[in-house]
Regions:
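Short Cys/His-rich metal-coordination motifs, predominantly Zn2+-binding knuckles/fingers
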Residues: 146-149
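Beta-strand elements of modular eukaryotic interaction domains
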Residues: 134-136
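Extended alpha-helical scaffolding segments
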Residues: 1-132, 156-518
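Short functional micro-motifs and their immediate structural scaffolds
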Residues: 151-154
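Flanking scaffold residues of small Cys/His-coordinated metal-binding clusters
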Residues: 138-141
Length: 518
């Protein structure tokens, strides 16, 4: 099985037909493919592989002028590069199997230490993973997994594997650690953003940063070489380790875990691999990550994280900021956009709690060029805060309803201690879910308001958005707070009063209004 020339990548053609494509086909005939047909974390991992090969084949692009020539140069360059390095993409090569380490030893008998490859799939019921969508995997480590699925899972596992306890193996006589670090794409449950174009080839070019843009994040660090060109010989191979973990190209296809598949790809040996320094330790952010200011006074920076309870569109204003020299902003790919260019933004994320995978998500947003203007994105952000204000008010109203109806509620909340937020979350959950579902169905109103800025329609569109928020909060309150008994009616009235009360105007805003009135 050759990862470069044999088909294993799930794609969709321009006609909408699903098929498997090879790495060579994606990079040389991608104009015939519409998109990938994979899970969110798999999309990010595959795109990193495509970009790594494209950079290596082109030895660039070094600047914007070279970036513009990528469509003409990449097909031939990729074909020649993959042919030159064909042996390094052999999955079962005797001495240099792709993304594996030959000659690993478990330190046990010949049969012991080999585990099922199902552990590489976050979506499979194996180890601590949930069985919710994979009942077949319960107590069934011997099931047959197709080799193409194993390759995709192996690549994604290297990028997104969370740290924790791990089996130990021997690499060149040295035993690996029993504790592992995070893969480069999973720290802080970071959000990843990719541009999408009309076909897969255009999408790859859109996300291929020039070396000028890469230097914004990596400064004087070396661009490096792909891991298959400088594969470490052992844990003591400092030069190859540095290339793999501290350079742009080296990190795109990481070796977070060292592994070796058996002859039929059904089992594997796996241990801790190379440690990849994260953003929290001062290392540059990943090219698809979003960096925000956490503390304006201290100018503390952090990665934009995915929280399963918060829809991605509420963070959109931070994602579309063009990354600046100090590293704050969205993905590097935004720097290739012209000022008047609209774009589709794919937002993918994987949420984790320590070593447990919680959820994956993916959304696609149409971003008008005007929305990327700072003043307009600030309006979008302000209106998102307005929607969150209504959500908070809905939660307080539901609490008032419960307190009036249940005399012991306040005591339970007070005695809940550290689990207070969990208790309140359960109380708010149904109402909040209904509210946000209604709001998301009407996101077009927010986009229409933003598009109307500077025109006579700005006030009507804003009022329509605000009216929808108010009505959605009221509908959610009515749905979860019953009115069947006198006590319920009294409790409903208390909560309704808080929900419908006019919002308090901040003192600063009151002063501005007085000045305006003269």
């Amino acid at each position: 099985m050759n990862v470069a020339f044999d088909p294993w990548i799930p794609v969709v053609t321009l006609e909408g037909t699903p098929k498997l494509a090879s790495l060579r086909e994606v990079l040389t005939e991608g104009q015939n493919l519409a998109d990938l047909a994979v899970r969110p974390h798999e999309r990010v991992s595959l795109m990193r592989l495509f970009l790594c090969v494209a950079h290596a084949a082109l030895d660039g692009p070094k600047d914007y002028d070279e970036w513009c020539k990528v469509p003409k140069r990449l097909p031939d360059a990729a074909r020649k590069y993959l042919t030159t390095w064909k042996d390094s993409f052999e999955l079962f090569h005797p001495t240099k199997p792709w993304l594996q380490v030959a000659g690993l030893e478990s330190g046990k008998s010949a049969e012991e230490g080999w585990g099922p490859v199902s552990k590489l799939g976050f979506f499979m019921a194996s180890g601590a993973n949930t069985t919710l969508f994979d009942h077949e995997g319960m107590n069934n480590d011997e099931r047959i997994i197709q080799l193409r699925s194993t390759i995709l899972s192996m690549l994604s596992f290297q990028c997104f594997s969370p740290g924790g306890l791990i089996s130990q193996v021997f690499w060149d006589g040295i035993q690996t650690s029993k504790s592992s670090k995070d893969g480069p794409c999973v720290s802080a449950s970071m959000i990843h953003c990719l541009l999408r174009r009309g076909d897969l080839f255009q999408t790859i070019q859109a996300n291929l940063p020039s070396y000028e843009d890469i230097r914004l994040s990596y400064a004087e660090r070396s661009v490096g070489r792909p891991i298959w060109e400088m594969m470490p010989d052992s844990l003591k191979d400092d030069l190859a380790r540095t290339n793999a973990t501290e350079t742009y190209l080296g990190r795109l296809v990481p070796l977070t875990r060292i592994m070796q598949l058996n002859c039929d790809g059904a089992k594997m040996l796996m241990g801790d691999g190379l440690p990849y320094p994260p953003f929290s330790d001062g290392f540059p952010p990943e090219p698809t990550a979003v960096v925000v200011i956490r503390d304006k006074e201290k100018q503390e920076r952090g990665l934009l994280s995915y929280r399963p309870g918060k829809a991605l569109w509420r963070e959109l204003a931070a994602m579309i900021v063009k990354r600046r020299a100090e590293g704050v902003g969205g993905p590097l790919s935004l720097r290739s956009l012209t000022e008047d260019e609209d774009c589709d933004l794919i937002v993918s994320a994987l949420a984790r709690d320590q070593a447990t995978i919680l959820d994956t998500t993916e959304s696609v947003y149409r971003i008008p060029s005007k929305l990327r203007i700072p003043e307009r994105s600030a309006v979008y952000e302000e209106e998102v805060r307005k929607s969150e204000d209504y959500a908070r008010r809905l939660g307080w109203s539901i609490e008032d309803y419960r307190k009036t109806l249940d005399g012991g509620w306040e005591g339970r909340v007070k005695n809940a201690g550290p689990s207070k937020n969990d208790l309140l979350g359960k109380l708010h959950g149904t109402g909040a879910s209904q509210y946000w579902t209604a709001v998301e169905k009407n996101l077009g109103l927010l986009m229409a308001h933003d598009a109307a800025l500077g025109t006579e329609d700005v006030v009507p569109t804003r009022d329509a958005w605000h009216k929808m928020l108010r009505q959605s909060a009221r509908d959610a309150y009515e749905a979860v707070c019953g009115q069947e008994t006198p006590r319920q009616i009294k409790a409903f009235t208390e909560g309704w009063r808080k929900l419908t009360a006019p919002p308090k105007v901040p003192e600063a805003q009151q002063k501005r209004r007085k000045v305006a009135k003269g």
